[in-house]
From Swiss-Prot:
Its cofactor is a divalent metal cation. One of its GO terms (biological process) is NAD metabolic process. It is an enzyme of class 2 (transferase). It comes from Lawsonia intracellularis (strain PHE/MN1-00). This is NAD kinase.
Length: 285
């Protein structure tokens, strides 16, 4: 990154501590001759995107939900993100609130590490036309409607027909996202440095298709049964779209979609241990 001149600051709406820290950060930037735009996380998407013209880095203060909702809007312009944790879990957000001054000093002096994370590009296809598309940082799910007992989804990988899977839904995830819904659905936990996508069926009626780890270059097409009752596409557990009969969802991976600043000593496996996703019992061998 060139000399930092323009920053974006977004704090979790309704969190007074995050709001106060956001204003402190804006003052810190002012003393460094860095201009900054400051918003709460409920800013309209169109207004947020208008503010990105000169943005070189985004500081997001909140939990994983705030991080996901704001970061999705930064993917297209490849704006790096630094997350400060004001949430309950904070799996995606590394920095503790008390450490923000040291982290910004490291950011300003180019001492943080910029990691490139895989994201998903998804599109809803209707009558051979893309009618909606976007990005996902964690995962996309084609799931059953509220009134449906089970959903039949036709699955194709690189135009090769895999078959029809009957389940509560089909979950496609990035490596970063496998630590969330994917492992809860008994899918694989994949290190984020692995160039791959995963496909997991949720509560499968007949366990005929195991969780799959697929090359990043894979194109996945999911087509719900035309008789399905309001099948639903969910993006990062935050955005939802009702699918009509004969709609298909196309999903691909993007190698360097999300740029995240981390500390030089960051360890993914250690992070998993801290969050309780990797544990062991001490005993004498």
């Amino acid at each position: 990154m060139k000399t930092l001149k323009h920053a974006l600051i977004v704090y979790k709406v309704g969190n007074p501590q995050a709001e106060k820290t956001a204003h402190d950060i804006q003052h810190w930037f002012y003393n460094k001759n860095v201009t900054s735009n400051l918003f709460s996380s409920d800013i309209p998407e169109s207004q947020l995107k208008q503010s990105l013209v000169h943005t070189q880095v985004a500081i997001i203060l909140g939990g994983d939900g705030t991080f996901l909702s704001i970061s999705r809007n930064l993917i297209e312009k490849q704006i790096p993100v630094l997350g400060i944790n004001f949430g309950q879990v904070g799996f995606l957000v590394e920095i503790h609130p008390e450490n923000w001054p040291q982290m910004l000093e490291q950011l300003y002096s180019h001492k943080l590490v910029l990691q490139k994370k895989i994201v998903l590009s998804w599109s809803i296809i209707r009558h051979n036309q893309v009618i909606k598309n976007g990005f996902a940082i964690n995962d996309v799910v084609v799931g059953r409607g509220a009134l449906a007992r089970v959903l039949a989804v036709d699955v194709s990988i690189n135009k090769h027909h895999i078959g029809v899977i009957r389940s509560d839904g089909i979950l496609v995830s990035t490596p970063l996202g496998t630590s969330g819904y994917t492992i809860s659905a008994h899918g694989p936990l994949v290190h984020p440095d692995v160039q791959a996508l995963t496909l997991t069926s949720v509560s499968t009626l007949f366990r005929s298709t195991p969780p799959l780890v697929l090359p990043l270059s894979t194109t996945i097409t999911l087509t719900p049964s035309p008789h399905a009752i309001e099948p639903f596409l969910t993006v990062d557990g935050q955005e939802g779209f009702v699918l009509k009969p004969n709609d298909s969802v196309g999903i691909q991976g993007i190698k360097s979609g999300l740029l995240i600043y981390t500390t030089a000593n960051y360890s993914y496996l250690q992070h998993l241990q801290k969050k309780g996703l990797l544990s062991s019992t001490d005993f004498n061998l």
